[in-house]
Amino acid sequence: MLKHDSMQVSQDQPIYSEAPLQLLLFVDGRPKSKQQVQRIRAYLKDLQAEYNFELQIIDVGQQPYLAEHFKLVATPALIKIHPEPRQILAGSNIITQLKNLWPRWQAAVDTYVKLQEDLQERVDDNGRVAQPTSTINSVAVSAELLRLSDEIFNLKQEKEKLLEQLQFKDRVIAMLVHDLRNPLTAAAIAIETLQSNYNPDIGQFQRLKPALVVNLLRQARTQAKTIDKMIADLLQVGRGTDTELIIIPQKTEIGLLCLEVLGELRDRYTTKAQKVETDIPQDLPCVYADPERIRQVLINLLDNAIKYTPEGGTISIAGLHRTTQKVQFSIGDTGPGIPTDNRERIFENHYRLERDEAKEGYGIGLSLCQRIIRAHYGQIWVDSNPHGGAWFHFTLPVYPS
């Protein structure tokens, strides 16, 4: 806020000063500088009784753009903005500097006044006497322009970010709508087959062997879980990454949980003739984690491993009691791997490698995995598979015995 001595002046009502000597005093709210500012103001007030000059007092906390405009590094600071050249006094001895410079400033003022008198006959095209360009009002306008420019820049960035988020959500929703058709159709066919062959009078399936009934039920359940994951992904996109991730940790057998997820994905990796190798020790301790959240992590990592491993390739799963406090779980594949430069970025929300733009997926799986693992005070990272491909590792706390 600009102040004329002790009088407050509104930003939208700037002062138009014609005083030959114009000064700005920059102050802040620090208690340590309060006494120094009072001494400077008292000295300037004494000078005003004898000399004609305009003094504006500026609080840098309320007008940071003016401080930026003058490139100030310390306060209090006294600036002579008119007549030119501009001079800045700062430090603990402002009054001493002012006493030394005041005669020169008055000499400059006398020269300026004499020059103005000589220019009275020189007018501009509108019949007005030319005014000095470096005035208190022009400084306030410059500071306001700096502030508005900053705001416009920030608003443009926010707009671009929001547009990017909206475009991403539109793309994900369109992909989900398309992808939901396959599991919905498969589940519907399985259920309709079971329904059309079920005789409620005898409580049995006709013309269907027990093994086929079990297979159809498994297929319907698997497709329902696929749909559930897609809906969870859609909800995650809608919520964004700024919402708090709620977890309900409990004693969890991560090895057993992983085998359950593998069973749900069996049709996918057997269709590609992929081999699954597991190295999960029987004495691997339970972890303290939210089983549904960790299921999401396992589904995402195994889904990626199946997706990127070629037909006939190998998917590896390993558990390791890394320390007395942590269990490490790892999932490896024999796919194309992750370039070294991208191993941090792949965990960013919406980020996808250029080579994967044509593949199915929404660019939120690994980001969600990282959020879940971090919510459990664990770590997740990726490195190279010695035989080609990638290894994803994550840690979880051991359940206290």
From Swiss-Prot:
<keyword id="KW-0090">Biological rhythms</keyword>
<keyword id="KW-0597">Phosphoprotein</keyword>
<dbReference type="GO" id="GO:0007623">
    <property type="term" value="P:circadian rhythm"/>
</dbReference>
<dbReference type="InterPro" id="IPR050736">
    <property type="entry name" value="Sensor_HK_Regulatory"/>
</dbReference>
<keyword id="KW-0418">Kinase</keyword>
<dbReference type="InterPro" id="IPR036890">
    <property type="entry name" value="HATPase_C_sf"/>
</dbReference>
<comment type="function">
    <text>Member of the two-component regulatory system SasA/RpaA involved in genome-wide circadian gene expression. One of several clock output pathways. Participates in the Kai clock protein complex, the main circadian regulator in cyanobacteria, via its interaction with KaiC. KaiC enhances the autophosphorylation activity of SasA, which then transfers its phosphate group to RpaA to activate it. In addition to its output function, recruits fold-shifted KaiB (KaiB(fs)) to KaiC to cooperatively form the KaiB(6):KaiC(6) complex (independent of SasA kinase activity).</text>
</comment>
<keyword id="KW-0067">ATP-binding</keyword>
<dbReference type="InterPro" id="IPR036097">
    <property type="entry name" value="HisK_dim/P_sf"/>
</dbReference>
<dbReference type="InterPro" id="IPR004358">
    <property type="entry name" value="Sig_transdc_His_kin-like_C"/>
</dbReference>
<keyword id="KW-0547">Nucleotide-binding</keyword>
<feature type="modified residue" description="Phosphohistidine; by autocatalysis">
    <location>
        <position position="178"/>
    </location>
</feature>
<dbReference type="InterPro" id="IPR005467">
    <property type="entry name" value="His_kinase_dom"/>
</dbReference>
<keyword id="KW-0808">Transferase</keyword>
<protein>
    <recommendedName>
        <fullName>Adaptive-response sensory kinase SasA</fullName>
        <ecNumber>2.7.13.3</ecNumber>
    </recommendedName>
</protein>
<dbReference type="InterPro" id="IPR023527">
    <property type="entry name" value="Kinase_SasA"/>
</dbReference>
<dbReference type="InterPro" id="IPR003661">
    <property type="entry name" value="HisK_dim/P_dom"/>
</dbReference>
<feature type="domain" description="Histidine kinase">
    <location>
        <begin position="175"/>
        <end position="400"/>
    </location>
</feature>
<dbReference type="GO" id="GO:0005524">
    <property type="term" value="F:ATP binding"/>
</dbReference>
<dbReference type="GO" id="GO:0000155">
    <property type="term" value="F:phosphorelay sensor kinase activity"/>
</dbReference>
<comment type="subunit">
    <text>Homooligomerizes. Interacts with KaiC. Participates in the KaiABC clock complex, whose core is composed of a KaiC homohexamer, 6 KaiB and up to 6 KaiA dimers. SasA and KaiB(fs) compete to bind to KaiC.</text>
</comment>
<dbReference type="InterPro" id="IPR011649">
    <property type="entry name" value="KaiB_domain"/>
</dbReference>
<dbReference type="Pfam" id="PF07689">
    <property type="entry name" value="KaiB"/>
</dbReference>
<dbReference type="InterPro" id="IPR036249">
    <property type="entry name" value="Thioredoxin-like_sf"/>
</dbReference>
<dbReference type="Pfam" id="PF00512">
    <property type="entry name" value="HisKA"/>
</dbReference>
<dbReference type="Pfam" id="PF02518">
    <property type="entry name" value="HATPase_c"/>
</dbReference>
<keyword id="KW-0902">Two-component regulatory system</keyword>
